[in-house]
Design a protein with these regions (language model features):
Chain B
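Bacterial N-terminal signal peptides
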Residues: 8-18
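Beta-propeller-forming repeat regions
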Residues: 23-566
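Positively charged n-region of N-terminal signal peptides that target proteins for export
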Residues: 1-6
Length: 515, 566
């Protein structure tokens, strides 16, 4: 949600101002089937025409795993049937998309258990198409029969215009720098596991729980939960013949994740990961990219952090460097701690700001509403007033906006500049299917707008003024013919005008602006 | 958590330091030998096996790519173990090794030997027989494979007797499939049979914001189901995936299984017929109406001829098909029952105690979106009804003979959420608590009682006869959870009770010995750190043997084996 999207032009607003009960005539409507994994639908330019195409993962008993590519034509239309079908061979575990070959459009990077390959979707076969790029023992070794994983957002670590790969291996990470002619060079290997720590010292996560659900005639269902001491020998001893015979294989292998991100002032991508420090607390580690594009063998900066709660990396103050957020929840009480990035280091023992919220299912994002590089904080949560629930079976969704801080030490203002409490009853449940989108400048006034599903399922857009107030009435609305469960707004054809992607239950509708 | 539970460890610890109050500290237990051991730090597990087939249990230590055997000596050779060095060990090379143990493979001389088997790099299966207490040279069992057994070294239960001929066969995991290799008497293999497998795979290779997440893969591959479904005495193969329900009947001649299923149900086709979920078709006044899109398949003998029949439920329609010795007669259902309402599930169970399985059809009342909103804030109840269609021999009665109602009572969602937080806090508080490792074993010779062993930092305390012998497994009957009886038709499950009574027990065994003096105290050679007690039976006598695992560090892991002396 924090990603900065380029401002969209005024044309869309001019065309959409006013209400409409159906798709605008200046928008080309296309509909395609969503398949089993609607969240995995991708948008990339696959044929090099500067228009985004759709990639839909698909599985069938006959064809196995496929990527269905729907190419957008010059008129903004998507065909009902896929333009290309890319077979995913059984050995493939994951894929990514990058511009690797001189031919226009993006190619596929295919990741198998022991190597990485490239493939063009423009060629219908693997023959004379599949190219081995390099060997790498991936952290995952067994492919899923029905689904192929997608690795999004390949970084350009050194700014040379070529996609790079930060790949987890069996025991460590490898940074592969991309170059011309599909060349990838292993530039750095590092472990995200603290190698200095004696395995005997690694905290074992406190007590284990032994849960037994017993059924007996006297007490009915009896739930017995017993605490077991932390043990370095859990499951260590067993008898060969007592083994579980319902499982052919059970195995798992995990390591802390690493993220490529800009962490200091030098405009280069660095590497961040979290593990257990020598003091047995959680620890954030930063490997900073040096001027020559190299990395040190050990982290340039480390800092201890309490690992309870969700720990996220997010640029909250718009300086282009990722900050650290720690979000703690206790039923309906939430505490958010902001730790600002200080040129590649943090004061993790002392948050720069602490904010507290009361509600359920808190959602947090930052968005540069005014487009001035100073993001506002958006908070959304639900409350369930008992009186409302009993009287008319309804809940309340609250949307709050906090302006950038104006006082010293404030990341965001302590009090919300805007608050919207909406009551949703059982009849208005369609309005709950998607959160309010604050990332798009729909009317082209240089300010983001609030796009939301109204209680009746109508998609509406309201302006947000300089005081972060939502306009009382929408400047645009669209009444879909089918329920919208999720929506995205993106410029699909590069004309600077926002296009709409509406996700229904079994299909999606694309509304692409036309001249 | 009671105050007593909190204080118990603290009470026990000072007691252990008062020699006047306690038994003399010693370095072993009466009737036991104490065998300290130090193993390489990378040892991942110990397996108890009788590798030399002498009736005494040996210890196989498994480390990445290295298998080490410690044989138990017979009393004639001094008994016990020598943990100073393995008696035999082998090193396996490969990035992916799935291993298994078996007694059903002959060695090069044709004698049946305990063997280590390994699927190496997914391409070949090797066997290392144990001969004269040594790993013999490997024997090629099968090669030219294309398999996935996960990265690293993993236990792979891939060698088992599928066709009950006394020879182990092989189940080789592939990409979403299992290849079954039936071994012939001459050590050759029949052409492999490929069956689909719904592997449970959880993979994460990338994180965007949440850096506390890990990357890697968790994998579980279920074994195939084998049982005789057509009453010919030979195990048949039942393969279930999301898409298909396949049955391969064993054949009397030629290859054991046919290459295609003897009969199958296409679950995709059923789902297509029932229709896909569409939000726009959802009846907000009856969300449970979605159950009409569900289906289930039961393979079970209904008519008592020993051959499994097929019960197919599609929404509220239940069809019964007849099993034959050669397959399933899907041409015409023997019976079709239709139920109105929202059918949740069906199963077969003898209700009227006539020895024949009856059909239980469960329905759930209509639930609206309004109900869900209401239950967010206030407690609710859902009635589930069971209709029992008695088995009349060839089929079920047209009308149910009995109707049961189960009221499922639950607290509001808000209350459940707050209870979940309370439970999480209870679990978190355990991080601060001292929980002593304990084990219940038979150290003394009293059959009717058991002894409690408590592992402290520097000693093991033994409280003789302090625990009850394990009770025979209760003869739980069907629906015992509801206090079920044939004379009662109204039942209740109250989830609120679970929440109200929820408590995590700590040191519960120690309550039984509160105030008691341990009969034995065993001094430990090194301090215990995150250790554990494990009970085993290694030499066949009536006394349990005890592994005392003390600590594992960068260089080694250490412990103590208390081995009873017969």
């Amino acid at each position: 949600m924090s990603a900065v999207r380029r401002p969209l032009g005024v044309l869309f607003a001019a065309l959409l101002l006013g209400s409409s009960a159906q798709a605008q005539p200046n928008h080309m409507a296309s509909e395609i089937g969503l398949g089993e994994w609607p969240d995995d639908v991708l948008r990339e330019d696959m044929d090099g025409d500067a228009r985004l195409d759709l990639i839909v993962p698909h599985w069938s008993a006959e064809a196995g795993r496929e990527l269905l590519v729907y190419l957008q034509d010059a008129g903004g239309h998507f065909p009902a049937e896929p333009s290309r079908r890319v077979e995913i061979k059984p050995e493939i575990i994951a894929f990514a998309l990058a511009d690797l070959r001189p031919e226009p459009g993006r190619e596929l990077l295919l990741f198998a258990g022991n190597g990485v390959f490239s493939l063009s979707s423009a060629i219908a076969s693997y023959t004379d198409n599949l190219r081995p790029l390099f060997d790498w023992p991936l952290a995952a070794s067994v492919p899923d029969r029905r689904r192929v994983l997608y690795l999004p957002g390949l970084p350009d670590m050194n700014g040379d215009g070529h996609a790079d790969l930060l790949l987890p291996g069996r025991d460590d990470y490898g940074l592969f720098l991309g170059g011309p002619d599909e060349r990838f060079t292993l530039a750095h290997r590092f472990s995200t596991i603290n190698q200095e720590l004696d395995p005997g010292e690694v905290p074992l996560g406190g007590a284990r729980l032994d849960t037994q659900l017993a059924i007996n005639e006297r007490q009915g269902i009896v739930l017995n939960v017993r605490a077991l001491g932390a043990s370095a020998f859990e499951g260590f001893l067993s008898s060969w013949q007592d083994s579980d015979t319902t499982t052919l294989l059970e195995a798992e292998h995990w390591q802390p994740a690493a993220v490529a991100a800009r962490m200091n002032d030098d405009d280069q991508q660095d590497i961040v990961f979290m593990n257990i420090g020598n003091d047995l607390y959680g620890q954030i580690n930063i490997l900073q990219q040096d001027a020559e594009g190299g990395f040190a063998a050990t982290p340039d900066w480390r800092g201890p952090i309490d690992t309870r709660g969700d720990i996220r990396l997010l640029d909250v103050n718009g300086d282009g460097r990722l900050d650290v957020l720690r979000i703690l929840d206790n039923s309906n009480e939430w505490t958010v701690q902001f730790h600002l990035n200080q040129n590649g280091s943090f004061r993790l023992d002392q948050p720069d700001q602490v904010m507290r919220f009361s509600g359920y299912d808190l959602t947090l994002s930052v968005t540069d509403i005014a487009g001035d590089g100073r993001p506002a904080l958006s908070i959304s949560y639900y409350t369930i007033p008992v009186v409302n629930a009993v009287r008319n079976a309804s809940i309340v969704r609250s949307q709050l906006l906090y302006a950038p801080g104006s006082e010293p030490g404030e990341v965001f203002s302590a009090r919300p500049a805007f608050r919207l409490d909406e009551n949703f009853s059982a009849e208005a449940v369609r309005g709950l299917s998607a959160q309010i989108d604050l990332q798009t400048d729909l009317d082209g006034d240089g300010r983001r707008d609030a796009i939301a599903l109204a209680p009746d399922g109508t998609l509406t857009a309201r302006a947000i003024d300089a005081g972060l107030q939502f306009a009382a009435t929408p400047f645009w609305q669209y009444v879909p013919t089918r329920s919208v469960l999720r929506f995205d707004v993106q410029d699909m054809n590069g004309d600077g005008v926002a296009d709409l992607l509406l996700y229904h239950s079994t299909a999606m509708t694309l509304l692409v602006s036309t001249p | 958590m009671t105050l007593l539970t909190r204080l118990l460890p603290a009470l026990l610890l000072p007691l252990s330091l008062s020699p006047a109050l306690l038994a003399q500290e010693s370095d072993t237990l009466p009737g036991y030998r104490s065998l300290p051991f130090t193993l390489p730090a990378d040892t991942e597990r110990l397996l108890l096996v009788d590798a030399d087939q002498d009736g005494l249990t040996d210890v196989l230590a498994v480390a990445p790519s290295r298998f080490s055997l410690y044989f138990q000596r017979t009393s004639a050779t001094g008994g016990g173990f020598d943990f100073s060095a393995p008696d035999t060990a082998i090193q396996l090379e490969g990035s992916s090794i799935g291993w298994e143990l078996s007694e059903n493979y002959p060695d090069a001389a044709g004698a049946s030997r305990f063997s280590l088997l390994a699927l190496v790099d997914g391409s070949r299966v090797l066997q290392w027989p144990i001969r004269e207490r040594q790993f013999a040279d490997p024997i090629d069992v099968l090669s030219g494979l294309s398999a996935f057994a996960g990265a690293g070294v993993n236990r792979l239960h891939f060698s088992r007797d599928i066709n009950a001929d006394g020879l182990d066969d092989l189940i080789i995991p592939g990409a979403g499939t299992l290849q079954l290799y039936i071994r012939n008497a001459d050590a050759s293999y029949q052409p492999p049979l490929a069956v689909q497998s719904d592997m449970q795979i959880r993979t994460n290779l990338f994180v965007r914001q949440g850096i506390e997440r890990d990357v890697g893969q968790a994998l579980r591959i279920p074994l195939v189901a084998l049982r005789d479904v057509n009453s010919d005495g030979q195990p048949d193969l039942i393969s279930e995936t999301e898409e298909r329900f396949d049955v391969f009947l064993a054949s009397g001649s030629g290859d054991y299984f046919p290459q295609s299923p003897s009969y199958f149900v296409d679950r995709l086709e059923i789902r297509e017929r029932l229709g896909n979920f569409d939000f726009d078709q959802l009846d907000f006044a009856n969300l449970t109406g979605m159950l009409s899109l569900t289906h289930e398949e039961l393979l079970q003998d209904v008519d008592g001829d020993g051959i499994d029949d097929f019960v197919l439920r599609e929404g509220g329609k239940v069809s019964l098909f007849s099993g034959t010795t050669t397959g399933m007669d899907f041409s015409q259902p023997r019976q079709v029952l239709r139920s109105s309402g929202n059918v949740l599930t069906t199963f077969l169970h003898d209700e009227n105690e006539d020895g024949r399985p009856d059909l239980w059809l469960w329905r759930v009342e209509s639930i609206s979106v309004g109900d869900l909103f209401l239950w967010l804030a206030i407690a609710g109840s859902i009635n589930v009804e069971a209709f029992v269609y008695p088995n009349e021999g060839e089929s079920f009665a047209r009308r149910p003979s009995r109707q049961l109602t189960v009221a499922l009572k639950f607290p509001s969602a808000v209350r459940m959420l707050s209870s979940a937080i309370d439970i999480r806090e209870q679990a978190r508080a355990l991080e601060e608590a001292t929980i002593l490792p304990t084990a219940i074993a038979q150290i003394g010779g009293v059959e009717s009682t058991r002894d409690l062993l408590v592992l402290l930092e520097d000693q093991v305390q033994v409280f003789m006869g302090s625990m009850d012998a394990p009770a025979a497994a209760p003869d739980d009957q069907f629906l015992a959870s509801l206090d079920y009886s044939r004379n009662r038709n109204e039942y209740e499950i109250d989830i609120r009770r679970f929440i109200d009574e929820f408590e995590i027990e700590q040191n519960s065994e120690l309550r039984r010995v509160e105030g008691r003096t341990p009969e034995h105290r065993l001094a430990l050679p090194v301090a215990m750190r995150n250790g554990e007690l494990q009970v085993a039976s290694l030499n066949g006598d009536v006394h349990d043997d005890v592994f005392v695992f003390l600590q594992r560090g960068r260089e080694s892991l250490s412990g103590l084996l208390l081995l009873s002396e017969p």
